[in-house]
């Protein structure tokens, strides 16, 4: 077992639905510690920078517009196999394909408004965490 850190974002649709506490409870019940957190309304430049890896994909503009449509909650999760554990909690990107009981199955409306983001690998987790948090903002 490897202790890892991963970035998680509760997206504007889930913030609007007021399910932040329910999502945090799932993280904690799965053994993930929230070691940094902030609420932020992303600027267009911040959203474009964060999702730059997708800039040539057809959904990029819609994704950026969605991510700046309201506030998000950004957190760093820490725990054993945190990346895989968080991805399991989130469920499939498309909530229609997500297993019952996952965050996306329970709280997401569509593949676009899919409630949460989570890092997919250790290198991207480290990069994504650095994008939003300085070392002095992380307590773990």
From Swiss-Prot:
It catalyses: a 2'-deoxyribonucleoside 5'-diphosphate + ATP = a 2'-deoxyribonucleoside 5'-triphosphate + ADP; a ribonucleoside 5'-diphosphate + ATP = a ribonucleoside 5'-triphosphate + ADP. PROSITE patterns: NDPK (PS00469), NDPK_LIKE (PS51374). Its main location: cytoplasm. The gene is ndk. It comes from the Bacteria. It comes from Francisella tularensis subsp. mediasiatica (strain FSC147). One of its GO terms (biological process) is UTP biosynthetic process. Its cofactor is Mg(2+). This is Nucleoside diphosphate kinase. Homotetramer. Pfam families: NDK. PANTHER family: NUCLEOSIDE DIPHOSPHATE KINASE (PTHR46161), NUCLEOSIDE DIPHOSPHATE KINASE DDB_G0292928-RELATED (PTHR46161:SF3).
